[in-house]
A protein has these predicted regions:
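The feature captures the beta-strand-to-loop junction immediately N-terminal to the Walker
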Residues: 39-41
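Catalytic Walker B motif of ABC-type/P-loop ATPase nucleotide-binding domains
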Residues: 165-168
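Conserved catalytic motifs of ABC-family nucleotide-binding domains
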Residues: 161
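Conserved ABC transporter NBD signature motif
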Residues: 62-73, 81
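Conserved ABC ATPase "signature" region
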Residues: 117-135
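Conserved ABC ATPase signature
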Residues: 140-144, 148
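Helix-to-loop junction immediately C-terminal to a conserved catalytic motif
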Residues: 54
Length: 209
């Protein structure tokens, strides 16, 4: 088992008038190679749950185990967890900031202190994994279409070589063509690269695809 979530609870603003119980006794087992669809209406706690899986939020109570280790243990390496559990936020293209696609996709591997050759390899592999040509590596990400920007943002997470990839509303704001292309690319990632994926959506149609 890759990850176990056991009786997870999370309360926003505990103890005051704005207290909200966002997650209540959540239990989930994630196995390697799973493709999990997480569906619910806006405000149902989907994003709150996913932000627990790579340690961005800490549970009010309950436990999370990654490869058998308690991520809330005092000596647990949270930085390593975040390199293994890749989280692509909603509208990830808003986080693009570099002058070229190459610099954006390679940002994570460069910050790991990897050798330049390994950084290059990861960057080229990640771009191909999202169905883009390496010819765009020297292009500014801001010259790309919305769907292409989204793929570049996903490639930046894939370049970190995560064992678990979480995509939060990956089709949000895209036109029908862009939505279909992104969903097909995600399905292909799972089929061809055997990456464990959690796809978060409010759309049953997206999950069904």
């Amino acid at each position: 088992m890759l990850m176990i979530i056991d009786k997870l609870n999370y309360i926003y603003n505990p103890g005051n008038a704005y207290e909200k119980h966002a997650l209540k006794d959540i239990n989930l087992v994630i196995n390697e190679g799973d493709f999990i669809g997480l569906i619910g209406h806006t405000g149902s706690g989907k994003s709150t749950l996913t932000q627990h899986l790579n340690g961005l939020l800490r549970a009010t109570s309950g436990s999370i185990y990654y490869r058998g280790q308690d991520i809330y243990a005092d000596n647990y390496n949270m930085k390593e967890l975040r390199s293994k559990v890749g989280l692509v936020f909603q509208y990830p293209e808003h986080q693009l900031f570099e002058t070229t696609v190459y610099k954006d996709v390679s940002f994570g591997p460069r910050n790991l202190g990897l050798e330049p050759l390994e950084v290059d390899l990861r960057t080229y592999e990640a771009i191909k994994m999202v169905g883009l040509s390496d010819e765009i590596l020297d292009v500014s990400p801001f010259e790309l279409s919305g769907g292409q920007k989204r793929r570049v943002a996903i490639a930046g997470v894939l370049a970190m070589k995560p064992e678990l990839l979480i995509l939060d509303e990956p089709t949000a704001g895209l036109d029908p063509k862009g939505r279909d292309e992104i969903l097909e690319q995600i399905a292909k990632l799972h089929r061809q690269n055997h990456i464990t994926i959690i796809l978060v959506s409010h759309s049953m149609e997206d999950i069904a695809k």
